[in-house]
Amino acid sequence: MKMEDMSLSGLDNTKLEALAHDVYSDLVEDACLGLCFEVHRAVKQGYFFLDETDQESMKDFEIVDQPGVDIFGQVYNQWKNKECVCPNCSRSIAASRFAPHLEKCLGMGRNSSRIANRRIASSNNTSKSESDQEDNDDINDNDWSYGSEKKAKKRKSEKNPNSPRRSKSLKHKNGELSGSVNPDMYKYNYSSGISYETLGPEELRSILTTQCGVVSEHTKKMCTRSQRCPQHTDEQRRAVRVFLLGPSASTLPDADTMLENEAYEPPDGQLIMSRLHWDASSDISPSDSASSKASTNNSESKRPKKKKPSTLSLTPAGERDKAQERDRIAGSGSSGSSSQNALGLSSRKKRPKLAVPPAPSIYDDLN
């Protein structure tokens, strides 16, 4: 007889019903528990009543498809400024200004990137210097040191004050620098002005001798224009000199004196020599005189006219020199027009020497 037959035969009907009830209750409990979990999750997530929404509430969120209004039923105004809320400072900003505001607010603009690049470069330089100190074995390697040597040479050429870039002649806004300016003054940047705090007394004196020197209230830089600067007055220049130099400011030359000295030219004897040559050429033959007159007129027309000094006058000694020069040129006039022209050119090119005591001549007895 089998085991199953024995177990079933030994059970009565009450026990069988109890077992069937237990199995059924387990199945119902599993089914109900799953449904309860699903309903609970739907309620917590907010989609339990999604299919059974009220029709009146649905009308509030209905998409509007009409001309002249947007999807929400509002009248569209194209002139109204669109506003955006900054996620960092929570300010409402116009849409056209939102991007630059966000760059500045978050620190992601151009200036911030430059600052970040400088920080990265400085950190790289510090780490590179530390690595160079640690790795001294590769100093003599040409492949590794070529770039650094090139950079070092470039830095030396930039620091060299005698480089051709620094030796270029600088100009004022109102004219060129005069020849009496100290060459050490070229090391300052004339486009941005000169800082008087870094200059010594001698440098200040040399600068204030030739330049305006009035200190700007905003930039704290000295004006590098001439002493006839139209932007500043004489009182301002005088006050700056007293402030910077103290009592020694009175020893500086005045602007009028500087201009008179620059405008003064010593009397040139070339004009006298050309006149002597003109007087002597009148004693030569007509053909020679015509050619010499034509050449002289051409040269005088090409040469710019000079202003005769009002105090120029010939003394008796000067008259004697003039007569001697006339006799000498008249005696040599018979040699021909070629020698005459050569003599005229040489007399024009040579500058007159210093005045020497006149030699005794036949005119002394007449006087």
UniProtKB/Swiss-Prot annotation:
UniProt-listed InterPro entries: SAGA_su_Sgf11, SCA7_dom, SGF11
Biased composition (Acidic residues): 132-141
One GO MF term attached to the UniProt entry: zinc ion binding
Annotated zinc fingers (SGF11-type), start-end: 84-105
A single cellular component GO annotation: SAGA complex
Disordered, as annotated region: 116-184, 280-367
PROSITE patterns: SCA7 (PS51505)
Biased composition (Basic and acidic residues): 318-329
UniProt-annotated location(s): Nucleus
Ranges of Low complexity composition bias in the record: 116-125, 280-299, 330-346
Domain SCA7, chain residue ranges per copy: 199-266
GO biological process: one example: regulation of transcription by RNA polymerase II
Record note on domains: The long N-terminal helix forms part of the 'assembly lobe' of the SAGA deubiquitination module.
Protein's job: Component of the transcription regulatory histone acetylation (HAT) complex SAGA, a multiprotein complex that activates transcription by remodeling chromatin and mediating histone acetylation and deubiquitination. Within the SAGA complex, participates in a subcomplex that specifically deubiquitinates histone H2B. The SAGA complex is recruited to specific gene promoters by activators, where it is required for transcription.
Subunit structure: Component of some SAGA transcription coactivator-HAT complexes. Within the SAGA complex, participates in a subcomplex of SAGA called the DUB module (deubiquitination module).
Family stated for the protein in its record: Belongs to the SGF11 family.
Name of the protein in question: Ataxin-7-like protein 3
Source organism (scientific name): Danio rerio (Zebrafish)
Gene, per the UniProt record: atxn7l3
